[in-house]
Regions:
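Cyclic nucleotide-binding regulatory module and flanking cytosolic helices
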Residues: 1-33, 82-83
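Phosphate-/nucleic-acid-contacting segments
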Residues: 150, 157-176
Length: 176
C-alpha cells in the first residue's frame, strides 16, 4: 500500500512519506487471521497502520466479555487514542484477516526529528485531526446510546448516518 493514501500522511509528498517512515523507524510485520497484533495492556506506546487486511480493536472486561471497539481496514490506524492515556485496560488488536501492519512508536511521532522538517509537522497535525474525528465519533455514539427508547436510538443513528453521507440513502457499517 502506498503510504500517501493513508490519512496520517495526507498532504505529504510521496518522497516525504518514504523519508518519514525511515525517520520514524517504522517496522512492518505480517499476522495471520486470528492472531493478536498488539496487546496494549502489556505493550503500549505503538501506533499501528493497517497496510493489508482487516483488524479489530477489542476490550475485555473483568468478566471476560469482549467488546469490539473498532474495526480497522486498509489504511486505517489503531492505537492513536491510547498514545498518552496511560491506559491499563485489557485492550488488544486482533487480525480479522491476514494482515500486514506497520508500527511506529509514539515517541517517534510526538518528538520533532533533528531535521525539523515541515512534513513532520503535517503528520502531527494529521494525527491530531484523526484523534479529533475519533473523539467526535465517540460523542455521536454517546448521543445515540443516551436516547431512551430503541426507536429513538435508531432514528438518531439513521439521522447521523444521513448527515455523514449528505443524503438520505446511505450504507450502514457492519453490514454486508
Amino acid at each position: 500500500m502506498d503510504f500517501c493514501n493513508i490519512a496520517l500522511f495526507e498532504n505529504v509528498s510521496h518522497h516525504d512519506c518514504e523519508r518519514m517512515m525511515q525517520c520514524f523507524h517504522a517496522t512492518n510485520a505480517n499476522f495471520p487471521a486470528g492472531a493478536v497484533i498488539c496487546d496494549y495492556e502489556k505493550t503500549s506506546g505503538r501506533l499501528g497502520i493497517v497496510l493489508k487486511g482487516m483488524a479489530s480493536l477489542i476490550r475485555t472486561d473483568e468478566n471476560g466479555s469482549r467488546t469490539i471497539l473498532e474495526r480497522v481496514g486498509e489504511g486505517g490506524l489503531f492505537g492513536e487514542c491510547l498514545a498518552f492515556s496511560g491506559n491499563q485496560d485489557a485492550i488488544y488488536v486482533t487480525a480479522d484477516t491476514d494482515c500486514e501492519i506497520s508500527f511506529i512508536t509514539y515517541d517517534e511521532i510526538s518528538k520533532r526529528c533533528s531535521n525539523a522538517c515541515a512534513c513532520h509537522t503535517q503528520i502531527t497535525e494529521n494525527l491530531f485531526r484523526l484523534i479529533s474525528e475519533k473523539a467526535l465519533g465517540l460523542s455521536e455514539r454517546v448521543e445515540v446510546l443516551s436516547r431512551r427508547s430503541i426507536r429513538d436510538r435508531l432514528l438518531c443513528y439513521f439521522n447521523l448516518c444521513a448527515d455523514h453521507a449528505k443524503q438520505t440513502v446511505f450504507s450502514i457499517p457492519f453490514t454486508g
